[in-house]
């Protein structure tokens, strides 16, 4: 898994370096002078001639059209994947530092087994992007009000989901005033509203422009690499959580996969990874 993360990071920073230095054009010029480049051009020309015979109206996209149709234009799946990844990473870092300053000790705030990614922050950014995009040009008060209710509802539903599916609770605000079932409270709803204004007015527009500068092919490859890694990471995390909760009533594994989970992600590992997690099923 860490090898995949390293490869993904290498490609990501390679894309950024290319954007800053114009390396694509330099690479193409070098390829054009090489024998491999000449062979590639001949193959490309042959394929292109066959395409033109099969589809007479087909033509190459001009540079002007490439500017009009950049990678991940508008609110689309490709862009939302990068919004999720970036927000999950930054959210985990911010929350880790915040909890370290408030509690006086560091703890993991990640939602998954591997990597510093908070799915709550990542999915929250996606939810705010999709639901509030239509209010981007409205007054900040409307954005704040929408973020207040949408963010509070989202946080509440996340708490309900994890308790129903995994039998775990990751936060409990019962000790705070104006809380709603201990799952959210008015103070954090207020923070959601403020965050919505900054997100939809400042942060997302800047992030959107940056994402659209990715080269189309590299962007597509990286997007699907991110999806594959995060899906595998998430599924493995779900399996480890479910096994953690069933281990108290069924310590002996039923199959080789459960043996793997017990060996790699035992109770000590899970408790270190998510120190604030409360297993409601274990306490019953």
PLM region spans:
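Aromatic-rich, lipid-facing transmembrane alpha helices and their immediate juxtamembrane interface loops
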Residues: 1-284
């Amino acid at each position: 898994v860490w090898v995949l993360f390293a490869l993904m990071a290498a490609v990501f920073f390679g894309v950024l370096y290319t954007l800053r230095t114009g390396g694509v054009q330099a690479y193409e010029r070098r390829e054009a002078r090489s024998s491999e480049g000449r062979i590639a051009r001949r193959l490309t020309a042959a394929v292109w001639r066959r395409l033109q015979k099969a589809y007479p109206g087909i033509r190459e996209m001009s540079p002007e059209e490439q500017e009009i149709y950049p990678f991940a234009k508008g609110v689309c799946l490709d862009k939302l994947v990068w919004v999720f990844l970036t927000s999950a990473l930054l959210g985990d870092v911010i929350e880790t530092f915040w909890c370290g300053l408030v509690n006086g000790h560091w703890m993991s705030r990640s939602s998954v087994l591997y990597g510093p990614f908070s799915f709550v922050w990542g999915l929250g950014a996606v939810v705010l992007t999709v639901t509030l995009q239509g209010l981007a040009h409205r007054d900040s008060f409307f954005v704040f009000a929408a973020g207040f209710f949408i963010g509070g509802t989202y946080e509440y539903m996340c708490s309900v989901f994890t308790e129903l599916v995994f039998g775990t609770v990751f936060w409990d605000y019962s000790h705070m005033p104006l809380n709603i079932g201990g799952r959210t409270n008015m103070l954090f709803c207020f923070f959601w509203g403020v965050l919505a204004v900054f997100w939809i007015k400042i942060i997302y527009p800047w992030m959107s422009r940056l994402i659209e500068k990715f080269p189309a092919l590299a962007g597509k490859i990286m997007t699907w690499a991110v999806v594959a890694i995060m899906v595998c990471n998430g599924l493995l995390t779900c399996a480890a959580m479910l096994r953690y909760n069933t281990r108290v009533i069924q310590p002996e594994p039923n199959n080789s996969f459960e043996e793997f989970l017990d060996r790699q992600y035992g109770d000590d590992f899970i408790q270190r990874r998510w120190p604030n997690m409360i297993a409601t099923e274990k306490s019953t």
